């Protein structure tokens, strides 16, 4: 079984999702493909996930890292599950702006992932990247479950 984690530079989120997954018997021997476009953040997550694999999973999973758009299809190839955790535009400045613009005009923005003005901004930034992901998934792992 293969799990590809898109946006693996989100270290805390990848640690939580993959760590929880490793706790399930069905996923002990899985292949984990960590994908990100930021080398430093990817390496940070890779070291953490590798350490977790050793400590809570007895090293049973195979953990690989894939950097950049040119390695995206390799990360996805043969995946059974694709977890998406990308943030186009980074927290600073984009997510901060997603909160500041509604506030400036007196609109309450409780969360900017999917709701309100901030959610619209985030969606507009993200949709073109997700379309690229979808094309690659259709080509190299058409039966994968995409979890956003």
Question: Can you say where each PLM-predicted feature lies in the sequence?
Answer:
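Residues at the starts of beta-strands that form the adenosine-phosphate
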Residues: 2, 31, 62, 145
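A short helix->loop->beta-strand "cap" motif at the edges of active sites that frequently abuts
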Residues: 125, 138-145
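Short, solvent-exposed beta-strand-terminating loops
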Residues: 81-103
